[in-house]
Swiss-Prot record:
One of its GO terms (biological process) is methylglyoxal catabolic process to D-lactate via S-lactoyl-glutathione. Pathway: Secondary metabolite metabolism; methylglyoxal degradation; (R)-lactate from methylglyoxal: step 2/2. It comes from the Bacteria. Zn(2+) 2 binds at residues 58-59, 137, 175. GO terms for molecular function: hydroxyacylglutathione hydrolase activity; metal ion binding. Disulfide bonds: none annotated. Its EC number is 3.1.2.6. The gene is gloB. It comes from Rippkaea orientalis (strain PCC 8801 / RF-1). Keywords: Hydrolase, Metal-binding, Zinc. This is Hydroxyacylglutathione hydrolase.
Amino acid sequence: MEIKRLPALSDNYIFLLYDADTQTAAVVDPAEPTPVLECLNKLGAQLVAIFNTHHHYDHVGANNQLQQYFPNLCIYGGSEDRGRIPGQQVFLKEGDRVEFGQRVGEVLFVPGHTRAHIAYYFPPKLSQETGELFCGDTLFGGGCGRLFEGTPTQMVNSLTKLRNLPDNTRVWCAHEYTLKNLQFALTVDPDNLVLKNRYHQVKEFRHQGQATVPSILGEEKLTNPFLRWDNSAIQLTIGMTDPARVFGKLRGMKDTF
């Protein structure tokens, strides 16, 4: 399974999964149709599936148009997003499986950013492969999504699920927010040398116009404050130890950063 990263809108990424053996493709969170159609045309591929993580327009905006071009494709989304995702045909819940090419993905229910948010985790099939996590707006490079419909407790539980995945998992988040997220992270975890090194690396990447997605989950665990609510240095900075309270305080600080 090849993964193509397609920039869209101002800072979104659409991810196109391509199976060369069958010349079929699936897309995750198509914000707009043109990048998808152009990539499909270059590959000579047929679109067979859309995997939506949640209902926000910048993740489902191309559903209807792509369905018009490929009327036999199947549109997947969370069961609690019924009526909110255009064209949705399959309603997924925690523990369900989705198949594409030779890979089988696991559905994770990760409410917080929205009440119905899901993520797709494709574990490695072969020893040389990595796991692939498509997490929408739940986890970002160096950050996480705002709480539009969920609570801090829900988000901590959701991020715990993601944090428990293998360290070498690639994190395909839906926005290019990493640099600003790391700038904030340094304000709450200023003595973290791994974080400082990552910040300088990401700053150089962005200066050169390079993407910072995907990131590696192991690096997120060491540098992303929203996966480090139980870190003693961050707890000391925040002045709290309860996970949901630490997370809620961090999220509130980031919202006004």
